Amino acid sequence: MRLSPWGRVVAISALLVVGSLVALVTGGLASRERRVVSYPVTGALQSLAFDLDAGDITIVGGGKRDEVEVRRTERYAFGRVPRTAKIVSAGVFKVTSRCPTSMLARCAVAYRVVVPDNVALDIRTTSGNVTLRGYRGTAKLATSSGAIEIAGYCGNALDARAGEGAITLAAICAPPQTTLRTGSGDIAASLLAGRYDIDAESASGDEHVRGVIDDDSAPYSVQALSTSGDVTVEGTS
């Protein structure tokens, strides 16, 4: 079939657009880079504060160690390196990480942090998973989109909130105050068997409380709330 002059112009333009997109995607794949940075943070720290926009973070309890150990893994393309700032002020180690805005150049930053006991945590990520392992202390964890996984936790207060994502908790002691909230996702909390002041609710999902005693006068409180998802609070020996 012969094309009219206008049809040929449209066809050529479409081919040029497709070719440009293919070149951009191919170039992006070829230019992907990975960079790993590790460093210690020494001195008397009271707390850590991480504010990430795109990336996972894993916090590992370091027991009685004297320093914080940070490992940052960056992935990016077209040289669009994540912007990271860190500062120690008044006993607080603060880290902020932002990826440049781009439709084609994907960017992500992943952190692995080893932290001594009783250094408080304030961890926030816009898009990413938060993992806490073997930590003893007070922790606030939040992600807008991602899962929160907590294992081997023992501390005074735990506050974990996800906009969209599941929350799992395995505690090895009875924290005085535990708050678990998600807008969309399941909540599964495993606690030591005993008495707790429990508020376990789901607006759209099943609720299960087993192996623990719900007692309003108990010294330990547990709040597990999901807007859409199952909520399970259970005791283990």
Question: Predicted segment positions?
Answer:
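Structural motif
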Residues: 53, 89-90, 126, 135, ...
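Non-cytosolic head/periplasmic domains of membrane-anchored proteins
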Residues: 96-171, 175
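Terminal targeting segments of Actinobacterial cell-envelope proteins
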Residues: 1-7
